[in-house]
Each structure stands twice: as structure tokens, then as C-alpha cells.
Amino acid sequence: MKRDYTTVLQLTDLHLFADPAGLFNNINTRDSFAKVLSHIHQHYERPDIIIITGDMAHDGATETYRFIAEALKTFSAPVFYVLGNHDHPENADQVYPLEWVTTSDHCLLSDWQIILVDSNNQPMADSYEGEISHSELQRIKAGLNYFIFNPAFSISLFLLF
């Protein structure tokens, strides 16, 4: 039976480590991640899509990205992600050329267009401030303009840049 709604699971700031005993702010992030996933599996239906919004791997290690991919495979849902300031793009790219995990800048889901915004100009930085580059703003503006001039349905939307 077709549902009349869409379920999105957003995960953010996982700060996981390759070392299972790794701590972030005195919290074992792997244990916390496992508890969150277990709770979701027990109490919610399968999401239609999973979106991870930055700081997946605190250490940026390839093994950490593999661990995340394996853990999320249990949902059988496509995964989209944008990296954070603790992530390491080259290591993520080694692991995530998977069919079900992508770093696309947008995703289409039912009647929804989700635009992922990269506010990270300095991967692996210790800075906590995000910054959206001029090129990223131009990409977002172009994407929004496309849908304003090619709408799936009639809407009123005003953009200020």
C-alpha cells in the first residue's frame, strides 16, 4: 500500500572514530550511534531517505566512513551526505562511491527537491564556524531559479540575494 507521506531520517554531527573506544566530549560516539540506530529500528518505520549533514567522522579515517556505511545499510534506504569541518573528503570518497550512498548536491524524493548546502570551506579544521562560499551560493541560486521557472505545480516564492 502506498503511503501518502515521505519519511526522512537526518543524522548530524556523529563525530565517530575508527577506534571503537573513541570519545568526543567524554561520550563514546559509537555507542551513542548504535543506540540511536537501534531506537529508530525499534520505534519507527524504514525511512525513505537518509541525509547526513556533516561531521560524520571526527577523525576523518577511512575505517570510520566504512563503519558508517555498514551501519546505515540496515535501513535499505538511499543515503545522501554533505561533509563537515571534521570530515576528510578524500577518505569519504574512497568509501562512498557506493550505489546507495552519494554526495550529490541535491536529491529528489516524491514531490520534494532537497538541496544540500556545503558550508565547509576548510575540511578537517578546528573552527566551528561554517561559511558558504560564493560558488556554493551561485549553485544554490541556480538550482532554486530552475525550479521557480520550471515548477511542478504553481507556487509563489520570492528570493532575496
Please annotate each region the language model reported.
Residues 14, 56-58, 85-89, 121, ...:
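Solvent-exposed loop/turn segments at secondary-structure junctions
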Residues 35-50, 128-161:
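His/acidic metal-ligating clusters that form di-metal
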Residues 10-12, 49-55, 79-85, 152-157:
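Active-site neighborhood of phospho(di)ester-bond hydrolases with catalytic His/Asp-centered motifs
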Residues 5-18, 112-121, 154-159:
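Active-site-proximal beta-strand elements of phosphoester/diester hydrolases
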Residues 8-9, 24-26, 30, 47-49, ...:
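Aromatic-residue detector
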Residues 62-149:
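Extended active-site neighborhood of metal-dependent phosphoesterases/phosphodiesterases
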